[in-house]
Each structure stands twice: as structure tokens, then as C-alpha cells.
Swiss-Prot record:
Keyword Amino-acid biosynthesis: no
Naturally occurring in which organism (per UniProt): Ehrlichia ruminantium (strain Gardel)
Role according to the record: This is one of the proteins that binds to the 5S RNA in the ribosome where it forms part of the central protuberance.
UniProt cross-references to PANTHER family, sorted A to Z: RIBOSOMAL PROTEIN L25/GLN-TRNA SYNTHETASE, ANTI-CODON-BINDING DOMAIN-CONTAINING PROTEIN, RIBOSOMAL PROTEIN L25_GLN-TRNA SYNTHETASE, ANTI-CODON-BINDING DOMAIN-CONTAINING PROTEIN
Assembly, per entry: Part of the 50S ribosomal subunit; part of the 5S rRNA/L5/L18/L25 subcomplex. Contacts the 5S rRNA. Binds to the 5S rRNA independently of L5 and L18.
Signal sequence interval, chain numbering: none
Keywords linked to the UniProt accession: Ribonucleoprotein, Ribosomal protein, RNA-binding, rRNA-binding
Protein's name in the database: Large ribosomal subunit protein bL25
GO CC field: cytosolic large ribosomal subunit
Classification via InterPro entries: Rbsml_bL25/Gln-tRNA_synth_N, Ribosomal_bL25/Gln-tRNA_synth, Ribosomal_bL25_b-dom, Ribosomal_bL25_C, Ribosomal_bL25_long, Ribosomal_L25_dom, Ribosomal_uL5_bac-type
Xref: NCBIfam families: bL25_bact_ctc (TIGR00731), PRK05618.1-2 (NF004128), PRK05943.1 (NF004612)
Ribonucleoprotein recorded as keyword: yes
UniProt record, GO biological process: translation
Pfam families in alphabetical order: Ribosomal_L25p, Ribosomal_TL5_C
């Protein structure tokens, strides 16, 4: 595990919980939060609104290990949920999960599609169809991926890229409901689709 994969934040323990104390924290520029996990008692904490927002905007926190410094103690966690105000969109509460470095975790990772302009099928007028923009994976905390790259350069019309085509580390397992799902396809050219649609419309009219 390298420093590049860890986001560090400061946190403080909450002495009081509930609606009233949480409102007071928010008025004072803090965000109420909780850390939970198997075989661990929930930990009620609060974060600096300013610090959390700066980290939240600069990194995909959902795919980073977070080192929470709570007083003199450090806890490694994952961010699992953020609650926002329905009107102001201000962050109201954050849920974290304790991490056991020897236990695999499940996490959703974004797919990054590269070389679309070099894609053989797109150059020939094909239509790019992206079916999945994220993947659910299982791995140890030190093997978390911030993103997964999907290279479109050699994708031709009528062909697809599946999960099995990805070059994933051996310690990462994809956990999706569908076995070996299709991630992206290249369908026929736009003109072909327009022609096909026109022919279908004509046939329907003649049957009427």
C-alpha cells in the first residue's frame, strides 16, 4: 500500500449524537459522521467541512483508502455513503467503514474509456454503445483500483469488449450479477441504422 492510494483526514470524536448536536456541528463548520464495521462498535465522529470538501473534490474518495486521524489514533476506512441536503446540496452526514487489511472488500470502481478517437469502428462511422460505466470488484484493501481502463482503439463494428478482455491484476475479482458482462459495443454506422429504420417503417405501412 503506497501513500498515493491513501487520503489522510483529521477527525474528532463526538461527545453527543442526535439531531440537535448534529445541527450544532454543521453550524460550526463540521460534518457529523460515523464509522462502522463487523465486530466493531460504531464510532461517532465529526470532520472539518472545509477539509473534507477539499479532499472530496480533488479525489474519488469512494475508491481510496482513507486514513482518519482521531486524536492520537489512526483508523483506515472506506467512505460508503454521503447524505446531502435536498435543497442546498450541502453534505449533512458521512458513513465510513472500518477496514481490516487482511479481509477482502467489495467496491465499485469507475471504468475509463480511452482512445475513442482512434477507435477503428468509430472511424468507420460506427456507433459506440457503453453498457457499463462501473464495475464491482472484490480485493484486499492494498489492491484497490482507483479506476479501470478500457482501450477502444482496436474495437471494430459488430464487436464488443467484455470483462474477460480487461487486463486486471490477479488479486482483483469482478463480482457482477451477470457472468462476463459486455462493457461496450460498436454497432453499425449511423447511416445504416437510418436506412434500416426507414425500411422497417415502410414495411409496417404496407402491412397496414
Amino acid at each position: 500500500m503506497t501513500d498515493q492510494t491513501i487520503v489522510k483526514m483529521n477527525a474528532e470524536l463526538r461527545n453527543s449524537v442526535g439531531t440537535g448536536p448534529s445541527r450544532t456541528l454543521r453550524r460550526n463548520g463540521a460534518i457529523p459522521a460515523v464509522v462502522y464495521g463487523k465486530h466493531r462498535s460504531p464510532l461517532s465522529i465529526y470532520l472539518s467541512d472545509r477539509e473534507f470538501l477539499s479532499k472530496y473534490r480533488s479525489a474519488a474518495l469512494s475508491t481510496h483508502l482513507i486514513e482518519l486521524e482521531i486524536g492520537e489514533k489512526k483508523e483506515y476506512v472506506l467512505m460508503r455513503d454521503i447524505q446531502k441536503h435536498p435543497v442546498t446540496d450541502r453534505i449533512q452526514h458521512v458513513d465510513f467503514q472500518f477496514i481490516d487489511h487482511g479481509t477482502e472488500i467489495k467496491i465499485e470502481v469507475p471504468l475509463v474509456f480511452v482512445n475513442e478517437q482512434r477507435c477503428v469502428g468509430v472511424k468507420k462511422g460506427g456507433v459506440l454503445n457503453i453498457l457499463h460505466r462501473t464495475l464491482h470488484i472484490k480485493c484486499l484493501p492494498n489492491a484497490i483500483l482507483q479506476s479501470i481502463e478500457v482501450d477502444l482503439a482496436n474495437l471494430t463494428i459488430g464487436h464488443s469488449i467484455h470483462v474477460s478482455d480487461l487486463n486486471l491484476p490477479s488479486e482483483v475479482t469482478v463480482v457482477m450479477k451477470e457472468h462476463n458482462p459486455t462493457l461496450v459495443t460498436i454497432s453499425g454506422t449511423s447511416s445504416d441504422q437510418d436506412t434500416s429504420g426507414g425500411e422497417s417503417s415502410g414495411t409496417t405501412t404496407s402491412e397496414d
